[in-house]
Amino acid sequence: MLDIRLFRNEPDTVKSKIELRGDDPKVVDEILELDEQRRKLISATEEMKARRNKVSEEIALKKRNKENADDVIAEMRTLGDDIKEKDSQLNEIDNKMTGILCRIPNLISDDVPQGESDEDNVEVKKWGTPREFSFEPKAHWDIVEELKMADFDRAAKVSGARFVYLTNEGAQLERALMNYMITKHTTQHGYTEMMVPQLVNADTMYGTGQLPKFEEDLFKVEKEGLYTIPTAEVPLTNFYRNEIIQPGVLPEKFTGQSACFRSEAGSAGRDTRGLIRLHQFDKVEMVRFEQPEDSWNALEEMTTNAEAILEELGLPYRRVILCTGDIGFSASKTYDIEVWLPSYNDYKEISSCSNCTDFQARRANIRFKRDKAAKPELAHTLNGSGLAVGRTFAAIVENYQNEDGTVTIPEALVPFMGGKTQISKPVK
């Protein structure tokens, strides 16, 4: 959520930033109009309360002097009714303002390129060279079924489309990837490992920006009023919701693996085969809490943390800056890391790393103190995939496939695969 002072002091800047996302800037005028009404109501209410205090003193004085106080008692009742009415009006305006403010996205950083869609994202880095095969490479969805690593048909029978059973070495590879990523982030990148709740309440979803605007993308347990998480970013960021982080704690760096659940509303017909776009998938997440002046350097560091996984696995990738028309709701700046997938003959997103500045912290009321005597300030929050496990799985299977149908295990994963160096079709 944006600071109301930005609307008051820099309305044109806010309008231009909103327009860059392709949204209607008239909401700024709506907010300013409501804010003016709100301030007038507060002023009027404060005057009434001051008068009520004075009338209360007059009543007490008249009673002490044994004088008739009926007139001032009547005024007191009228003032009470008027104050109650003003408070009701103020509450209504506050709700209207919050309803609008909570749907306005974060302000985009000045160095984000302008554009309308992912076609306008700007490549800033490329690592590795896509492999040239001496045979016709197969898509990962064919490889995993031939090697008995996955079963899409039985998953569809049990749960519907966009689900998968990982079986045999497929399940082992998924588990190995999660363990490898978490181990690297905790032992080399300085993150604290967390196991997170995978069902969260509405306040939690509101804090990170999923609610109220993106409810259609979520799965909800209606009876309990809980939501399945679309990413571990949600519970990790909300760890400090409604808290003041004490001096000396920041920077705080969390990493955690979780299942992620997404309805994929609006993605019909896209990536319908394989592991790229499922309703349920595993992901290792990185979340950071930073002092405002440190958050931009933290974004660069976190992005290189994600890239280090791909480099050690030997998977070619590129980094792009998301343009103004493609960046997410809560982010001020986002890097996407895209891995090379031979089946697409293209790079596909495998990680998004974002600086959300104080946007989520304001929604979730996450503050910190620089020292014990300091006034609490809003922290900056960052999040990044480190990495999407299923897409890493697909990239390994496709990039490390062999002509005889086997798949070579990247050297970095061998210790996490029990020493296994290759995946072959099971004997039975």
Swiss-Prot record:
Q: Localized where?
A: Cytoplasm
Q: What is its EC number?
A: 6.1.1.11
Pathway where this protein functions: Aminoacyl-tRNA biosynthesis; selenocysteinyl-tRNA(Sec) biosynthesis; L-seryl-tRNA(Sec) from L-serine and tRNA(Sec): step 1/1
Which Gene3D superfamilies does the record associate with it?
Bira Bifunctional Protein, Domain 2 (3.30.930.10), Serine-tRNA synthetase, tRNA binding domain (1.10.287.40)
Q: What Gene Ontology cellular-component terms does the record carry?
A: cytoplasm
Q: List the disulfide bonds.
A: none
Q: Where does L-serine bind?
A: 231-233, 285, 385
SUPFAM superfamilies tied to this protein: Class II aaRS and biotin synthetases, tRNA-binding arm
- Looking at the keywords, is Nuclease present? no
InterPro entries recorded: aa-tRNA-synt_IIb (IPR002314), aa-tRNA-synth_II (IPR006195), aa-tRNA-synth_II/BPL/LPL (IPR045864), Ser-tRNA-ligase_type_1 (IPR002317), Ser-tRNA-synth_1_N (IPR015866), SerRS_1_N_sf (IPR042103), SerRS_core (IPR033729), tRNA-bd_arm (IPR010978)
Q: Which UniProt keywords apply?
A: Aminoacyl-tRNA synthetase, ATP-binding, Cytoplasm, Ligase, Nucleotide-binding, Protein biosynthesis
Major location, coarse class?
cytoplasm
Which reaction equation describes what this protein catalyses? tRNA(Ser) + L-serine + ATP = L-seryl-tRNA(Ser) + AMP + diphosphate + H(+); tRNA(Sec) + L-serine + ATP = L-seryl-tRNA(Sec) + AMP + diphosphate + H(+)
Q: Locate the residues binding ATP.
A: 262-264, 349-352
Family annotation (Pfam families): Seryl_tRNA_N, tRNA-synt_2b
Determine if Ligase is one of this entry's keywords: yes
Q: Name one GO biological process term.
A: seryl-tRNA aminoacylation
Gene Ontology MF term list: ATP binding; catalytic activity, acting on a protein; serine-tRNA ligase activity; transferase activity
Free-text comment about domains = Consists of two distinct domains, a catalytic core and a N-terminal extension that is involved in tRNA binding.
HAMAP family per record: Ser_tRNA_synth_type1 (MF_00176)
Give the protein's biological function.
Answer: Catalyzes the attachment of serine to tRNA(Ser). Is also able to aminoacylate tRNA(Sec) with serine, to form the misacylated tRNA L-seryl-tRNA(Sec), which will be further converted into selenocysteinyl-tRNA(Sec).
Describe the protein's quaternary organization and the partners it interacts with: Homodimer. The tRNA molecule binds across the dimer.
> What family does this chain come from, according to its entry?
Belongs to the class-II aminoacyl-tRNA synthetase family. Type-1 seryl-tRNA synthetase subfamily.
Protein name, entry field: Serine--tRNA ligase
The coding gene here is serS
